[in-house]
């Protein structure tokens, strides 16, 4: 009974992690542009 819950958590975490990395990269890119690098 643990596997469905674990797979659900993993499937829920993967998109959130990818979205977080995308936002972090976007903010870092904008911050770099503001400093004129």
From Swiss-Prot:
GO terms for molecular function: electron transporter, transferring electrons within cytochrome b6/f complex of photosystem II activity. Disulfide bonds: none annotated. It is a single-pass membrane protein. Its main location: plastid. Keywords: Chloroplast, Electron transport, Membrane, Photosynthesis, Plastid, Thylakoid, Transmembrane, Transmembrane helix, Transport. Component of the cytochrome b6-f complex, which mediates electron transfer between photosystem II (PSII) and photosystem I (PSI), cyclic electron flow around PSI, and state transitions. PetG is required for either the stability or assembly of the cytochrome b6-f complex. The 4 large subunits of the cytochrome b6-f complex are cytochrome b6, subunit IV (17 kDa polypeptide, PetD), cytochrome f and the Rieske protein, while the 4 small subunits are PetG, PetL, PetM and PetN. The complex functions as a dimer. This is Cytochrome b6-f complex subunit 5.
């Amino acid at each position: 009974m643990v596997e469905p819950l674990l797979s659900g958590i993993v499937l829920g975490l993967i998109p959130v992690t990818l979205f977080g990395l995308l936002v972090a990269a976007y903010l870092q890119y904008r911050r770099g542009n503001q400093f004129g690098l």
